[in-house]
Amino acid sequence: MIFKPELIKGIAKTSHPYGCRKEVLNQIEYCKNAKQFHGPKKVLIIGASSGFGLATRISLAFGGAKADTIGVSFETGITDRRTGTAGWYNNIFFKEFAEKEGLIAKNFIGDAFSDEVKENVIKYIKNEFGKIDLLIYSLASPRRKDPKTGNIYDSTLKTTSGEFQGPTIDMETDELVTTKVNSATDKEIEATKKVMGGEDWSEWCKLLLENDCLSDKAITISYSYIGASRTYKIYREGTIGEAKRHLENTAIQIDKEWQKKINGKAFVSVNKAIVTKASAYIPSFSLYAAVLYKVMKEKNLHENCIMQMQRMFADKIYAENLLEFDDSGRLRMDDWELREDVQSEVNELWEKITPDNFKILSDYDGYKKEFMQLNGFEIDGVNYSEDIDIEALKRLEP
């Protein structure tokens, strides 16, 4: 079978298995050649199969720390209807490369919100893996079933203060279109907080603590985004922003508990605007990111996921100098994005953009290429005309 890209309304319907393998390898090579750091040896990553979660896992294994890792993710292999998600193949090939280096790379495929997955992970930590030095919570999910009540919650991408209308790039047609987003109801806001807020992160932290699965001075980190004022209405002041504030407030509570019990630390890292499977859905975000990419590349400041995570660990978290937080206790990895000169140029370009010139005034080609690479396409060194043996793929297990 020949694997070809298929995009429908900004959602990738296909992935290329060996393109995913090459992209994982490219990220590994970047980390091996970047500034190294001494860090944790035992790491648990909730949401480990793509985006910041995958980059975190690769950086910790290959960027100096040589960490053994457990990855939890919800992915699917080959079925009658699908050829396997990119995350499925990322898990498989990360494990292959990590084990070649003598590292443990355990994958749990399932619903991270569920009691069953939590119990299985804790059992593995206690019986085989050893205590966790670092817990990363990087889950991006559209839905959550609360195991305590059985209630199902769906997250929404809406404002909380009236209708939003703004330009968005349609990657299927390569056109700039106008998107309208309605204001969320109170019920939708609360549901989004249930899915994308800090409740499940807190539950993982509590269970790991209760089951003596954490080393002394263990750290836990989750990821957030604030962005520029241009994105506030749909993001920071929208349903996602409400959920992220809940996440950030949860970090404060976890931090108090971990400091008291294990002399540990909990905080949120506010990251840069980057192409991920999750961010591609956000109205207007694609255009903002494409313009930002152009400006930051011209200033030699651009970072993709793996570059940002390697800098975070090497220059911030595991550097010799004291770790600095903002007034709300957050690590700011969006420091380069929010530089005054960067935002000034982004705003200047934004005011000039039309449906006819947006590809010239932004780095749309670079933005879309990064999106395609998330799914294993447009990667140098991959033979996309190769007829791939489906039966051989089916035998690969994460």
From Swiss-Prot:
A biological process from GO: fatty acid biosynthetic process
Binding site for NAD(+): 47-52, 74-75, 111-112, 139-140, 244, 274-276
Annotated residues for binding of substrate: 225
Entry protein name: Trans-2-enoyl-CoA reductase [NADH]
Gene Ontology terms for molecular function: enoyl-[acyl-carrier-protein] reductase (NADH) activity; NAD binding; trans-2-enoyl-CoA reductase (NADH) activity
InterPro entries assigned to the protein according to its UniProt record, in alphabetical order: Eno_Rdtase_FAD-bd_dom, Enoyl-CoA_Rdtase_cat_dom, FabV-like_NADH_b, NAD(P)-bd_dom_sf, Trans-2-enoyl-CoA_reductase
Sequence intervals crossing the membrane: none
Annotated active site: 235 (proton donor)
UniProt superkingdom: Bacteria
Assembly behavior: Monomer.
UniProt EC number: 1.3.1.44
Pathway in which the depicted protein is active: Lipid metabolism; fatty acid biosynthesis
Source taxonomy: Bacteria, Bacillati, Bacillota, Clostridia, Eubacteriales
Site (Plays an important role in discriminating NADH against NADPH): 75
Signal peptide: none
Keywords from the named record: Fatty acid biosynthesis, Fatty acid metabolism, Lipid biosynthesis, Lipid metabolism, NAD, Oxidoreductase
Keyword Chloroplast appears in the UniProt entry: no
Protein family per UniProt: Belongs to the TER reductase family.
EC primary class: oxidoreductase
Purpose of the protein: Involved in the fatty acid synthesis (FAS II). Catalyzes the reduction of a carbon-carbon double bond in an enoyl moiety that is covalently linked to a coenzyme A (CoA).
Keyword Ion transport included in the entry's annotation: no
Reaction catalysis annotation: a 2,3-saturated acyl-CoA + NAD(+) = a (2E)-enoyl-CoA + NADH + H(+)
